[in-house]
């Protein structure tokens, strides 16, 4: 019977990071959609940076940012007692950083695909911006938000480079599935690594299949 600890650590890290990304992604998408300014493109470029930056670069930046020598790391570790580096919290932080752009991108695109005349009509009828957002914008962007959430969760499950840099490989604490596969191969235990490889491949196929089914349903509705 294989040790399921890496599986449950990955699920916990991915779940917590996805909840955070879900909330922050929708919040930022709403701000960027409703409050366009000259800074919009710059902010979006910064948000999307984790997509193109190497994971090791992200991990290095996070390691420096949360180290005790940095003001933020000092505040969290020495004053608030929250240790990020080489803990599962660090794995969550890494997963949030790498998966956030996917959630944001899908959500804001879902908002932009809505016909603005629907919201303008609601405004002329006296609906508040808050009511428009919760009654029109969110429901009509449901598929985009679900797709973004699924991709964010999948990205968090598969995160390796940044997690290795900031959380390290600590059995029973930070050994997520990608890290476990890497170190099993390093130890010459490829037959054990195959189990987790098949788990991740099956998970990825199920995510992609579900998203394709959702897209097909959307196209049928349009037709």
Spans of model-derived segments:
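Faces of alpha-helical transmembrane segments in polytopic inner-membrane proteins
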Residues: 24, 46-55, 82-108, 139-143, ...
């Amino acid at each position: 019977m294989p040790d399921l600890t890496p599986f449950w650590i990955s699920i916990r890290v991915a779940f917590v990071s996805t909840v955070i990304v879900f909330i922050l992604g929708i919040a930022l998408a709403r701000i960027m959609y409703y409050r366009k300014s000259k800074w919009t493109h710059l902010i979006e470029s910064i948000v999307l940076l984790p997509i193109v930056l190497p994971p090791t670069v992200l991990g290095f930046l996070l390691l420096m940012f949360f180290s005790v020598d940095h003001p933020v790391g000092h505040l969290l570790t020495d004053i608030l007692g929250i240790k990020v580096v080489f803990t599962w919290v660090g794995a969550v932080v890494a997963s949030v950083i790498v998966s956030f752009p996917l959630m944001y991108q899908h959500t804001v695109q879902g908002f932009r695909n809505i016909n603005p005349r629907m919201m303008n009509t609601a405004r002329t009828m006296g609906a508040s911006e808050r009511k428009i957002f919760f009654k029109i914008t969110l429901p009509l962007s449901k598929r985009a938000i679900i797709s973004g959430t699924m991709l964010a969760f999948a990205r968090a499950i598969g995160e390796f480079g940044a997690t290795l840099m900031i959380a390290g490989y600590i059995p029973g604490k930070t050994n997520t599935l990608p890290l476990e596969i890497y170190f099993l191969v390093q130890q010459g235990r490829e037959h054990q690594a195959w189990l987790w490889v098949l788990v991740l491949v099956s998970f990825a196929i199920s995510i992609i299949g579900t998203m394709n089914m959702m897209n097909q349903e959307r196209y049928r509705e349009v037709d």
